[in-house]
Amino acid sequence: CKMPRQTGKSTTVVSYLLHYAIFNDNVNIAILANKASTARDLLGRLQLAYENLPKWMQQGVLVWNKGSLELENGSKILAASTSASAVRGGSYNVIFLDEFAFIPNHIADQFFASVYPTISSGQKTKVIIVSTPRGMNHFYRMWHDAERGKNEYLSLIHISEPTRLPG
């Protein structure tokens, strides 16, 4: 989604992930960021959102630590840094890549090579990528290919406040 900096993109996605985990049983979600500390921060935002839900909406929590969450309904959320091995071998319903433009090209290429079987095996697997632009890199190529219909990703541009037009 093409939006200005500091407009709550990552927090909005984390809120969506929490909703998805609570209202869907046995789903696996990965929150991946350019640094492990950033991914843990996003999981912390998810925890804050969870703690502020009405009690009737809160699922029982089986595991909650710095890097993961497991709910009573079988849903799991992993937080880690983006790497070639971050989600290898796993089956994920949603993969969230935060600040993806800050991942070095060789790691981004290795990541997508390793995660492609996971993404393509599930017909309903979602990949959400959010980033501040940073030069002509993997993120840039994916975005522009999506705009031209050269890949299966969607580039979303959202402008809710006309005075904050991007570009």
Name the predicted role of every residue range.
Residues 1-160, 164:
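Phosphate/NTP-binding elements of NTP-utilizing enzymes
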